[in-house]
Swiss-Prot record:
UniProt keyword terms in alphabetical order: ATP-binding, Cytoplasm, Fatty acid metabolism, Ligase, Lipid metabolism, Nucleotide-binding
Coiled coil, from the record: none
NCBIfam families in the record: ac_ac_CoA_syn, PRK03584.1
Gene Ontology CC terms, in alphabetical order: cytosol
Protein name as it appears in the record: Acetoacetyl-CoA synthetase
Keyword Iron attached: no
Family: Belongs to the ATP-dependent AMP-binding enzyme family.
Role: Converts acetoacetate to acetoacetyl-CoA in the cytosol. Ketone body-utilizing enzyme, responsible for the synthesis of cholesterol and fatty acids.
Gene coding for it: aacs
Catalytic activity reported: acetoacetate + ATP + CoA = acetoacetyl-CoA + AMP + diphosphate
Amino acid sequence: MSKDTEAKSEEIMESKVLWYPDSKRNTQTDRFRTLVNREFGLNLANYNDLYQWSVDSYPEFWAQVWKFCGITCSKMYEEVVDVSKRISDVPEWFKGSRLNYAENLLKHKDQDKVALYAASEAKEEIVKVTFGELRRDVALFAAAMRKMGIKIGDRVVGYLPNGVHAVEAMLAAASIGAIWSSTSPDFGVNGVLDRISQIQPKLIFSVAAVVYNGKQHDHMEKLQNVVKGLPDLKKVVVIPYVRSRQETDLSKIPNSVFLEDFLATGKEGDQDPQLEFEQLPFSHPLFIMYSSGTTGAPKCMVHSAGGTLIQHLKEHILHGNMTFNDVIIYYTTTGWMMWNWLISSLAVGASVVLYDGSPLVPSANVLWDLVDRLGITIFGTGAKWLAVLEERDQKPASTHSLQTLHTLLSTGSPLKPQSYEYVYSCIKNNVLLGSISGGTDIISCFMGQNMTVPVYRGEIQARNLGMAVESWSCEGKPVWGESGELVCLKPIPCQPTHFWNDENGSKYHKAYFSTFPGVWAHGDYCKINPKTGGVVMLGRSDGTLNPNGVRFGSSEIYNIVEAFDEVSDSLCVPQYNSDGEERVILFLKMGPNKSFSQELVGKIRGAIRVALSARHVPALILETKDIPYTISGKKVEVAVKQVIAGKEVTQRGAFSNPDSLDLYKNLPELQNF
């Protein structure tokens, strides 16, 4: 190990503890560990022991999760998984079992308990839906779908905001065995068609208009253009949503019908239809999810009903310590995998809060108001939003009670170390801050929140149970306390069963198994702390920087740069010359009323040199007016890398601010390298 690396490894080991677990050790993870010890005659003393057993004995582990989390099935499995198969073989899980995802979310005996709270920027009123009402509505949706000919394997799409109708339509599709896919109304026509035209849906649900940032936005023109690009559609169901039916003209959209009229076709006389759950294999497709599509057509990942269910139950119950008494919100749209993850909380019997609108309108308190109003216990958001609150000097701890809140989750991008301090000083000092990380590729997390181990500043607490995750060097060797590629060594039930339109599996293989044969390479760069077991995410592998043979992740730079008050955001990318030499370019977006200066550049260079090393200091530091983000709030380094190399980025539908890419074209400072 070099002196430089040794120093960094020491530094990572000395993280500050911000939260300690309850000494009573009576979490669901502790109870699960006790059961495993009893069942297998083991003496697993703590989370680390349990984690090691879960990856060494993964078939036994997943069988115990099935039992502990109470999965409902009509036929029990014959085999958990074939242990002779590698993760790259995409083995079948729980062969022989028959179940239904929707049934597992709607099985609760207390039909009067609130399943969904729906709040929106558009209305003061919060809509409540009990489990009994949700079952009744899903039955009606499903009956209408069956009536129009939707059957097992057909694709049903929601181009919908995060509200009750999206949940009902998704559960109805799942009850039949149809495959659900969704995207949010903030996606433009091209962004939607790049995704859903690939899967040839028969049915689409959408809305007439939405409200965001205090304004009503018409959605009909976009919907009309989307429908034109989907020749296999049999029906378009329109929900007036924030408009009245009278104000909505369906005449330009073929095969369109209002939701009310569509649901009426599911009724037989005055009788409410019975809810029937098709009993399907564990590996039956449930969701089609999409890669970001920032560098090419989005990949269509097919996720199984059983794999999604068991993985989400594991994360909610064992990692989140969730029970039926919890009330959870995740600030998300239907176009992000966190929506699917959130809705699976219904399987635990928890109440789910759906919010549609801006998290900053009418004020930055809107979501904290909901915490106090609804008694929210688990609150999830993107790391970027927490940074924005800190920038605005928001202090929810002094304006809100937040008494019920026990867990605050963050994902979407690496959570900066200073955001940890902000949460504990300005939001709540005894909350579990769970930075969670995984991806759409597994519709879940590799590492995340954990009620049994401490929270260290700047670190994700631990690798999740059953996820054989390591950080590997380019040579394919595990590294500890050093930067490396995030890999998963053993099969997991939540990996996609396949990609849509990938007959021979070549796209799937290229996406995950072309870097290290037989091992899943996730495309993230990370560092695992050998002392704490915590993980630091360092950005996407395609955003990895390697000037002068020093390999590091862009987040290492962001954590330093964005601690400067003058800097509101930053972007760090490599530039290559014709000989293949690399230099690092750092772009700074200045904060309000702050100006870019050579004095600031000097300070930033000095801070990077001290915190990392002289070899981490960017070759050039330039000002930019904007930084490109995807619609789900992820910074897009790889697209800027392409632009500064003189390449055109054609897939602009995935960006929330596509015009920002033009700011990086033909920059004089980047010529003649």
